[in-house]
From Swiss-Prot:
Keywords: ATP-binding, Cell membrane, Endoplasmic reticulum, Lipid transport, Magnesium, Membrane, Metal-binding, Nucleotide-binding, Phosphoprotein, Translocase, Transmembrane, Transmembrane helix, Transport
Catalytic residues as annotated in Swiss-Prot or TrEMBL: 427
Protein's name according to its UniProt entry: Phospholipid-transporting ATPase VA
GO cellular component terms attached to this protein's record: endoplasmic reticulum; endoplasmic reticulum membrane; membrane; phospholipid-translocating ATPase complex; plasma membrane
Similarity field: Belongs to the cation transport ATPase (P-type) (TC 3.A.3) family. Type IV subfamily.
Species the sequence originates in: Homo sapiens
Summary of activators and inhibitors of this protein: Inhibited under hypotonic conditions.
Length: 1499
């Protein structure tokens, strides 16, 4: 039973007093009698009836109801929702306005047809979706479970919908939890159960849940009838990682409740026979349903622009109606005396005044011209976007075979935003890297152990990369980077040395096997778990073992170790137990290894602490060495393993070795003690090899495997103890008192244990070096011990810098020994924090900070996180596409910088500005210094101070194209502390301006809040389109802030995916998603929206021009049936198909020419001037389509509809031909829809004209179309008018493609010229690799040859014309697949460097060229040809002549004249390109022609 705590009444009106809602809720058992009931049986029966009626405790029951409508509420509720869209309100208003007799233009019922049709389609879709939800709800609500019945005194089967808060539920293995349940009993002897949360967050690794304190010690089975405790917990919320509360027993004692005690709805019980719990939250109050908010809705940039243009159309509609109203009023005033000839007077003989007639005319024109607002545009956009999402999901190139996952489109309405991204913000760990940690190096007590053998072993797992073999020796690398540690400096560093490759290039089979296993365990491949020990460290471990073996029967065992050996011992103990790793068996992957020792439970109260740590208990409570040895022999690990075969077919059986073989150990010259324990290890090797570790963090698994390599083996973890297997000492069981988990603020985790050898309370801490080094106990320089500790810390810090410089992730390991008094004092405050319901997180945080102080440094580790496949190539392609990439990581600065070099985010020959500051004043000074340096290098001036906004010089959305004096823009590296200062209000403008001038930005040690603040800053200040990509929970905030959020389903769960708009398996798929699908989606939608605006404007223009011939009386010459259904039926399907299937550029051209992506960034397809040009063209076409039929039928005896029907026919044909001009890729569906539209129009017209004999007397459309089909003038007019109307657009498109083409038009021209030969030219600037000669056959099986037209003059720039010759395969190229790179050069072997400046491409000429001939064009701010490759020679244009020969020849002449002008104007600017002669190649290894924003010619 649950009751709300009484709250104070708030003042209010009489009769409407309301209580302030409390922050907690009280839950009681439903089996208890209600308060005030005298008869328990009667009270119980009453409570049972209340529960069955679904009103128990007046709270929501467990019934799931996701439907929005009922049979009675569907129509009004759905209409109410649809009328929230302004367009629907507008069209309904117009339809209702048509019911006014004085202003109606159409039949009232007919005017409602379009809007009713749109509303009906939307309503039917909503009804179907709601019905699907109803079926799903019914299925879930009628699932069964066991609920305890008071009347029957046993568990009975009931439906999920019959469960209420306060019920006791019993779940068996593999059953799904029906509600949020507090765990009170488990069949596990340790009070544990394992759950799978895949249905909740997508994570397949099992999680442990613990029985509430006080119930796990019960010997007998839990009886719900005896449960009388009261539960106080927090209100329902959607935080899956948080649950706070307490349970109050009859004796008044409280026990804290945490998320480990809560079983969430939707999770599945695994590896536990049965559990019992009480329902805390039911139905829609459960955390799962509170998190189920449905698909995210965002409004795309194109949609926002479209809404603005719709407003312009509304304004244009008002202006046209107002113009007609004024014209009609003036016309009435002028012909006042002749009004009786054309106006029917009223019954009293009076007539309308000019003003009144003008007002009526205004309203009537609003109705007539309503088509100007595209009624079907929004529905068409939804259909096109749904189809785009479908095709993206069906792209097999976005499927990852290794992880068996594919791209997911979670946001259905921002697909076009993928084609307009300007800034990418990326996490590092798990996004650019694999997040599969491999132990590489460590330092203990100031001594470094390089693990060279382990490095050599890892090298065998990756292929040799010839381009990255030149590595500077480690010492030089360290010395050069030694200055990185300064915290208040700004440096411009020229990177000269190479970095070690971090790319994993092992076999695909191994990678696939490892990824399959990674779904269930943290690390499973041999590369990641088989650690080769360092001989020196192994010798230290052996020496430590000898000392412990000699003193094994003495009391103070660890006191016999030297300080160095003691640190070694504690170092590996900390690696083993300072984590949350769960031990499992491969035979039963979901079965925890249990070797239970009879130890006392964890400390939960002060009384328990006093009893536990009295002197008598300290001597008798700990296990002796002899007993530990006995435990080792009596509790064989193999006996605890089930003998049943594995039921998980997806998991592979892994054989894990325990350390080195005995022969290898003996060969190192170890003592006989080492031989003895080595022989013992060999005996238990078969059982120990069956261990498997499941870790929530990859770092933890790597460290546990590293400790295992040194024979410190984690064999068991329970909620109150951790067992470790050691040589000679056997199995040590550490009592686990507390676990202080990792969080992004503390950046560390700690465990509090009682040591079995000393009975001391130890705190082991591991975390980031930036925080742990500051928590160490102060050292005195007076005594020798203090000086020694300072020396150790200094050495450790130097080694940490070495590890970070090599790209390794660093962690520091520390320890603290607590006295009894210190622990008692801390425990009291910690228990108070645990039992607090308000500010519990803050209190626990402060409690952890008080404990993690005065630490003793043990050592540090370096873990390698390898780059994902294809990351450098993807970053290079994205940069060529004009995208600026920022990496926001929480890693150490040196580590992040090294990874940035490895993934080509930073280049070795570029300048790097490193910004580290210790205060806000220092950060401001450093920013000013950086800005001065930027100005001195020839970049833009510093921003001026503005109010609330960045300077106007920030108006450019794309990254600046200006470069430094050395030709490259610098990169910026900033640490987390400096970033916090830079994000302050008074410094953010300077920081943003500096970052905008940099080629790359790397933010290190950044928190999740800082990540989101950086994204928000760029998005709001620069008005740029942003994309954030990450894989972990710490990336959720920036993913949600960005315009487009992309999540990666990696090692850290599915939180990022659940918060994202799109989910990709790996980072490399971002290239295809943006450059290909993003460009296509934007281009299709932009052109479709423009076409809808054009089509409606052109059709409205026909009606508007007619007003000049009818006195602006709002009359129409087109039948109202055509007016109503023309845009809705006859002309809506072809643009829809084009919007779904059109491809302006083939896939291979886009992928090999990322520069084409810039068209979307610059909004070339849809910008304001394009919109108004389109509207002007529509007005011209409407004038032509009106004038020619008017002249053709002038002075004829045809009636109004006979003249209007050819106009409608001409409009339809003009629309389709216009669409044909704008369509880039024609498919059979395009032809079918166009033919269907024409056929449908004539069919409807013939049927309608034949059946409508007396529709609109006296002028009726009877037999109109039949008569026109027999008139030659009709055919002549329908043929001539569309050609005349479209001639200017056709001429402009042809002229534009030949004189001033855009990059996209050039790419399309090459594709249209020869699909078989277009791939080679466009790939000459794709990736910058050169072959040995032009006749070399590549992996694709094609050979590229070069040639030039024979008619080309020798003085003209040589243009390559390529052809593909395939041996044994078809001659055509599959345009749906990316084409491999081919080159057009001969006789070259050295690769030519690529141009990295934005807007530049590389052209390699096949002809001879002087040494180092380069022409760099200045940016003009306008998108122009990629290179001279696309500007064809003068006479080669004759080959492009299409059916419109006059236009093509005129374009050729203009191109010839323009070429000569350019050649004359640039005489002497660039080096001439020599004419082609035979097979002569270039005379050097690096001959290229750089063509920028403007196309230049060299003589």
């Amino acid at each position: 039973m649950e009751r709300e705590p009484a709250g104070t009444e708030e003042p209010g009106p009489p009769g409407r007093r309301r209580r302030r809602e409390g922050r907690t809720r009280t839950v009681r058992s439903n089996l208890l009698p209600p308060p005030g009931a005298e008869d328990p049986a009667a009270g119980a029966a009453k409570g049972e009836r209340r529960r069955r009626r679904g009103c128990a405790q007046h709270l929501a029951d467990n019934r799931l109801k996701t439907t929005k409508y009922t049979l009675l509420s569907f129509l009004p509720k759905n209409l109410f929702e649809q009328f929230h869209r302004p367009a629907n309100v507008y069209f309904v208003f117009i339809a209702l306005l048509n019911f006014v007799p004085a202003v109606n233009a159409f039949q009232p019922g007919l005017a409602l047809a379009p809007v009713l049709f749109i509303l009906a389609i939307t309503a039917f879709r909503d009804l179907w979706e709601d019905y699907s939800r109803h079926r799903s709800d019914h299925k879930i609500n009628h699932l069964g479970c066991l609920v305890f019945s008071r009347e029957e005194k046993k568990y009975v089967n009931r439906f999920w919908k019959e469960i209420h808060v306060g019920d006791f539920v019993r779940l068996r293995c593999n059953e799904i939890f029906p509600a949020d349940i507090l765990l009170l009993s488990s069949s596990d002897p340790d009070g544990l159960c394992h759950i799978e949360t895949a249905n909740l967050d997508g994570e397949t690794n099992l999680k442990r849940r613990q029985v509430v304190r006080g119930f796990s010690e019960l010997v007998s089975e839990f009886n719900p009838l005896t449960f009388t405790s009261v539960i106080e917990c927090e209100k329902p919320n959607n935080d899956l990682s948080r649950f706070r509360g307490c349970i109050i027993h009859d004796n008044g004692k409280k026990a804290g409740l945490y998320k480990e005690n809560l079983l969430l709805r939707g999770c599945t019980l695994r590896n536990t026979d049965a559990v019992v719990g009480i329902v805390i939250y039911a139905g829609h109050e459960t955390k799962a349903l509170l998190n189920n908010s449905g698909p995210r809705y965002k409004r795309s940039k194109l949609e926002r622009q479209m809404n603005c243009d719709v407003l312009w159309c509304v304004l244009l509609l008002v202006c046209m109606s107002l113009f007609s109203a004024v014209g009609h009023g003036l016309w009435i005033w002028r012909y006042q005396e002749k009004k009786s000839l054309f106006y029917v007077p009223k019954s009293d003989g009076s007539s309308l005044s000019p003003v009144t007639a003008a007002v009526y005319s205004f309203l009537t024109m609003i109705i007539v011209l309503q088509v100007l607002i595209p009624i079907s545009l929004y529905v068409s956009i939804e259909i096109v976007k749904a189809c785009q999402v479908y095709f993206i999901n069906q792209d097999m190139q976005l499927y990852d075979e290794e992880t068996d996952s594919q791209l997911q489109c979670r946001a259905l309405n921002i697909t076009e935003d993928l084609g307009q991204i300007q800034y990418i913000f990326s996490d590092k760990t798990g996004t650019l890297t694999e997040n599969k940690m491999v132990f590489r190096r460590c330092t203990v007590s100031g001594v470094e152990y390089s693990h060279d053998a382990n490095a050599q072993r890892l090298a065998r797992y990756q292929e040799a990369d010839s381009e990255e073999e030149e590595v500077v020796p480690r010492g030089g690398s360290v010395s050069q980077r030694g200055s990185i540690g300064s915290h208040q400096s700004v440096r411009v560093v020229h990177r000269t040395q190479s970095t070690k490759s971090h790319r994993r290039t092992g076999s695909r089979a191994e990678a696939k096997r490892a990824s399959m296993l990674s779904k269930h365990t943290a690390f499973s491949s041999p590369m990641e778990k088989d650690i080769t020990p360092d001989p020196k460290l192994l010798e230290k471990v052996s020496e430590c073992d000898k000392s412990l073996a000699v003193a094994r029967h003495q009391e103070h065992l660890l006191a016999h170790l030297s300080p160095e050996l003691s640190d070694v011992f504690d170092f590996f103990i900390a690696l083993t137990i300072c984590n949350t790793v769960v031990v499992t068996s491969p035979d039963q992957p979901r079965t925890k290894v249990r070797v239970r020792f009879e130890l006392k439970s964890p400390v939960k109260t002060i009384e328990d602490f006093l009893r536990r740590f009295t002197p008598s208990c300290l001597t008798s409570g700990c296990s002796s060495i002899g007993s530990l040895a006995a435990n080792k022999s009596s509790h064989k690990l193999g006996s605890s393993f089930p003998s049943t075969p594995s039921s998980d077919g997806m998991l592979l059986r892994l054989e894990e070795r325990l350390g080195q073989p005995t022969s290898a150990i003996a060969s190192n010259g170890y003592s006989s003690q080492a031989d003895n324990w080595a022989s013992e290890l060999a005996q238990e090797q078969e059982s120990e090899r069956e261990l498997r570790y499941e870790a929530e963090s990859p770092d933890e698994a790597a460290l546990v495997y590293a400790a295992r390599a040194y024979n410190c083996v984690l064999v068991e973890r329970l909620h109150d103890q951790v067992s470790v297997e050691l040589p000679h000492l056997g199995r040590l069981t550490f009592e686990l008192l507390h676990t202080l988990g990792f969080d992004s603020v503390r950046k560390r985790m700690s465990v509090v244990i009682r040591h079995p050898l000393t009975d001391e309370i130890n705190v082991y801490t591991k975390g980031a070096d930036s925080v742990v080094m500051d928590l160490l106990q102060p050292c005195s320089s007076v005594d020798a011990r203090g000086r020694h500790q300072k020396k150790i810390r200094s050495k450790t810090q130097n080694y940490l810098n070495v590890y970070a410089a090599e790209g390794l992730r660093t962690l520091c390991i520390a320890k603290r020994v607590l006295s009894k008094e210190e622990y008692a004092c801390w425990l009291q405050s910690h228990l108070e924090a645990e039992s607090s319901l308000e500010n519990s997180e803050e209190l626990l945080f402060q409690s952890a900070i008080r404990l993690e102080t005065n630490l003793h440094l043990l050592g540090a580790t370096g873990i390698e996180d390898r780059l994902q496949d294809g990351v450098p190539e993807t970053i290079s392609k994205l940069r060529q596409a004009g995208l600026q990439i920022w990496v926001l990581t929480g890693d150490k600065q040196e580590t992040a910088v090294n990874i940035a070099y490895a993934c080509k985010l930073l280049d070795h020959d570029e300048e790097v500005i490193t910004l580290n500051a210790t205060s806000q004043e220092a950060c401001a000074a450093l920013l000013d210094q950086c800005l001065c340096y930027v100005q001195s290098r020839g970049l833009q001036r510093a921003p001026e101070k503005t109010k609330g906004k960045v300077s106007m010089r920030f108006s450019s959305l794309c990254p600046p194209s200006t470069s430094t004096a050395s030709g490259r823009r610098p990169s910026l590296v900033i640490d987390g502390r400096s970033l916090a200062y830079a994000l302050e209000k008074n410094l953010e403008d300077k920081f943003l301006f500096l970052a905008k001038q940099c080629r790359s930005v790397l933010c290190c040690r950044s928190t999740p809040l800082q990540k989101s603040m950086v994204v928000k800053l760029v998005r709001s200040k620069l008005k740029a389109m942003t994309l954030a990509i990450g894989d972990g929970a710490n990336d959720v905030s920036m993913i949600q802030v960005a315009d487009v959020g992309v999540g990666i389903s990696g090692q850290e769960g599915m939180q990022a995916v659940m918060a994202s708009d799109f989910a990709v398996p790996k980072f490399r798929y971002l290239e295809r998603l943006l450059i290909l699908h993003g460009h296509w989606c934007y281009s299709r939608l932009a052109n479709m929206v423009l076409y809808f605006f054009y089509k409606n404007t052109m059709f409205v223009g026909l009606l508007f021009w007619f007003q000049f011939f009818c006195g602006f009386s709002a009359s129409t010459m087109i039948d109202q049936w055509y007016l109503i259904f023309f845009n809705l039926l006859f002309s809506s399907l072809p643009p829809l198909v084009t919007g779904v299937l059109d491809r302006d550029v083939p896939a291979n051209v886009l992928l090999t020419n990322p520069q084409l992506y810039k068209s979307g960034q610059n909004m070339e397809e849809y910008r304001p001037r394009t919109f108004w040009f389109n509207m002007a063209d529509a007005a011209f076409q409407s004038l032509v389509c009106f004038s020619i039929p008017y002249l053709a039928y002038y002075d004829s005896n045809v009636d109004l509809f006979t003249w209007g029907t050819p106009i409608v026919t001409i409009a339809l044909l003009t629309f389709l031909l216009h669409l044909g001009i704008e369509t880039k890729t024609w498919t059979w569906l395009n032809w079918i829809t166009c033919g269907f539209s024409v056929l449908l129009f004539f069919t409807v017209a013939l049927i309608y004209n034949a059946s409508c004999a007396t529709c609109y007397p006296p002028s009726n459309p009877y037999w109109t179309m039949q008569a026109l089909l027999g008139d030659p003038v009709f055919y002549l007019t329908c043929l001539m008018t569309p050609v005349a109307a479209l001639l200017p657009r056709l001429f402009f498109r042809s002229l534009q493609g030949r004189v001033f083409p855009t990059q996209l038009q050039l790419a399309r021209q090459l594709t249209r010229k020869s699909p078989r030969r277009c791939s080679a030219p466009k790939e000459t600037f794709a990736q910058g690799r050169l072959p040995k000669d032009s006749g070399t056959e590549h992996s694709s099986g094609r050979t590229v040859k070069t040639s030039v037209p024979l008619s080309q003059p020798s003085w003209h720039t040589q243009q390559p014309v390529c052809s593909l010759e395939a041996s044994g395969e078809p001659s055509t190229v599959d345009m749906s697949m990316p084409v491999r790179e081919h080159t057009l050069l001969e006789g070259l072997s050295a690769p030519a460097p690529m141009s990295s400046a934005p807007g530049e491409a590389v052209l390699r000429s096949p002809g001879g060229c002087p040494e180092e001939s380069k022409v760099r064009a200045a940016s003009t701010g306008r998108v122009t040809p990629l290179s001279s490759l696309f500007s064809l020679p003068t006479f080669s244009l004759l080959n492009w002549i299409s059916s419109w020969s006059l236009v093509s020849r005129l374009g050729s002449v203009l191109q010839f004249s323009r070429t000569e002008q350019l050649a004359d104007g640039q005489a002497g600017r660039g080096l001439p390109v020599q004419p082609h002669s035979g097979r002569s190649g270039l005379q050097g290894p690096d001959h290229r022609l750089l063509i920028g924003a403007s196309s230049r010619r060299s003589q």
